[in-house]
């Protein structure tokens, strides 16, 4: 019987094999997704030149089992590779210090204004709403930073990510990286994308309905009705999951994760300690304290959740054969959906309304997504690929109708045991 670590090596990159699972900062889950597959394209789009240089210095290994041949590159895949090279050459992957200075200052300003209105003018409800908006916008900013879009030095990205993610948000950046990078590597692929594993209470595929317990199926029958309530509560769930994940870091096989344990724990402890002290010293009553706490958390959670769910969840979930047949770039286009560009939409969605472009190149700075989207749309037209781009309210309708499909399926499913 192979140990988990043995099962997770080697990884095939550019016709060579490497053992990276024991130190990979992006997590072991993404490595697991590419066992027995060529990971070249996924590696290329999720790393900068620094990682390529490090890879060249690593010893190559001889795998103990036969690896598949390097994945064939079709015309569409080749065109997207060429476009990436053009974008690099024209500086589109270079972050604007001015833009990110503006984004950091305005995002912090939302939180400062919220606290100021509560402390100075006792405007508790308005202040709590602003604080919730701060949490939402800080979520997108942390997302940019943890994808290494913001700073050229990855150590600065990691440090600021800890401050903004753990300290100001209460989210573990290591927990986020582990799940989010796996999601990027295998979007909407059942058994590989952790984002679509939401049982209970949400079913996103026929397989989910089949696997659900009889009690879960009863619940799923109404999922399109309670979905928005779940969005409101998700920040609480995520924060709780982050605490559990950070507690487990010190026992992980991945040495990078073990090295992050103390930093992550200090960041989360600081977030909740400062929040508790604010409520203790600046809230006039327990009721006001509860109002501020729940309004800010619910607004922040809903603002993040509704964006995240809209961009790829209402699209068909696929298995390994379809995933392998698409190739990386084409697969991302088939399994992601944009939301129509616009000033308000771009701000509220934090650039994730350009989900197609972001999934093609996760390290592309947010402020360049709009310009690049026109080029991607043209390539999609050239290769007869879908470029979904509904308005925000249309995207929500698509999402709710998709949930309703599996709600009806759960209603018709025999009341036997889950498979």
Curated annotation (Swiss-Prot):
Listed GO biological process terms: fatty acid metabolic process; sphingolipid metabolic process
Subcellular location as annotated: Membrane
Organism: Euglena gracilis
More info: Euglena gracilis exhibits the metabolic behavior of a plant in the light and of an animal in the dark. Grown in the dark, this organism contains large amounts of 20-carbon chain length (C20) polyunsaturated fatty acids (PUFA), including arachidonic acid (C20:4n-6), and little or no C18 PUFAs (such as linolenic acid, C18:3). On the other hand, when grown under photoauxotrophic conditions, this organism is rich in linolenic acid and contain relatively small amounts of the C20 PUFAs.
Residues of the Cytochrome b5 heme-binding domain: 1-64
Short motif Histidine box-2, span: 180-184
Domain of life where this protein originates: Eukaryota
Motif Histidine box-3, chain ranges: 355-359
UniProt membrane topology term: Multi-pass membrane protein
Source organism phylogeny: Eukaryota, Discoba, Euglenozoa, Euglenida, Spirocuta
GO molecular function ontology, one term from the record: acyl-lipid (11-3)-desaturase activity
The name this protein goes by in its record: Delta(8)-fatty-acid desaturase
Main location: membrane
One Pfam family it belongs to: FA_desaturase
UniProt GO cellular component terms: membrane
Comment field on protein domains: The histidine box domains may contain the active site and/or be involved in metal ion binding.
Record gene name: efd1
Cofactors required: Fe cation
Pathway where it operates: Lipid metabolism; fatty acid metabolism
């Amino acid at each position: 019987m192979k140990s988990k670590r043995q099962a997770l090596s080697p990884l095939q990159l550019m016709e060579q094999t490497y053992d990276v699972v024991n130190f990979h900062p992006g997590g072991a889950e993404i490595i697991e997704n590419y066992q027995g597959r060529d990971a070249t394209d996924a590696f290329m789009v999720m790393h900068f030149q620094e990682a390529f240089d490090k890879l060249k210095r690593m010893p190559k290994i001889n795998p103990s089992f036969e690896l598949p041949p390097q994945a064939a590159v079709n015309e569409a895949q080749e065109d997207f590779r060429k476009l990436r090279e053009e974008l690099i050459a024209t500086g589109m992957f270079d972050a604007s210090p001015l833009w990110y200075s503006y984004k950091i200052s305005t995002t912090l300003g939302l939180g400062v204004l919220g606290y100021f209105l509560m402390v100075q003018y006792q405007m508790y409800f308005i202040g709590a709403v602003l604080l919730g908006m701060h949490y939402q916008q800080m979520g997108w900013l942390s997302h940019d930073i943890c994808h290494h879009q913001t700073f050229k030095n990855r150590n600065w990205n990691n440090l600021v990510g800890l401050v903004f993610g753990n300290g100001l948000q209460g989210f573990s950046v290591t927990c986020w990286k582990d799940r989010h990078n796996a999601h990027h590597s295998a979007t909407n692929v059942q058994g590989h994308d952790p984002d679509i594993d939401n049982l209970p209470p949400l079913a996103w595929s026929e397989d989910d309905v089949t696997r659900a317990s009889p009690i879960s199926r009863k619940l799923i029958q109404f999922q399109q009705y309670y979905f928005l309530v779940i969005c409101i509560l998700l920040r609480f769930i995520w924060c709780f999951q982050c605490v559990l994940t950070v507690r487990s870091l010190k026992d992980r096989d991945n040495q990078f994760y073990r090295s992050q344990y103390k930093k992550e724990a200090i960041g989360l402890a600081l977030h909740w300690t400062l929040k508790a002290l604010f409520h203790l010293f600046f809230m006039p009553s327990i009721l006001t304290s509860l109002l501020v706490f729940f309004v800010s958390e619910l607004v922040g959670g809903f603002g993040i959740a509704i964006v995240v769910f809209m961009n790829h969840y209402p699209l068909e979930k696929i298995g390994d054969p379809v995933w392998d047949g698409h190739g990386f770039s084409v697969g991302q286009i088939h399994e992601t959906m944009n939301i129509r560009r616009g000033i308000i939409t771009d701000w509220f969605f934090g650039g994730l309304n350009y989900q197609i472009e972001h999934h093609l190149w996760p390290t592309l700075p947010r402020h360049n997504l709009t310009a690049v989207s026109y080029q991607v749309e043209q390539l999609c037209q050239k290769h007869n690929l879908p470029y979904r781009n509904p308005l925000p309210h249309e995207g929500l309708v698509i999402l709710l109708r998709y949930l309703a499909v599996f709600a009806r399926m759960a209603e018709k499913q025999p009341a036997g045991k889950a498979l």
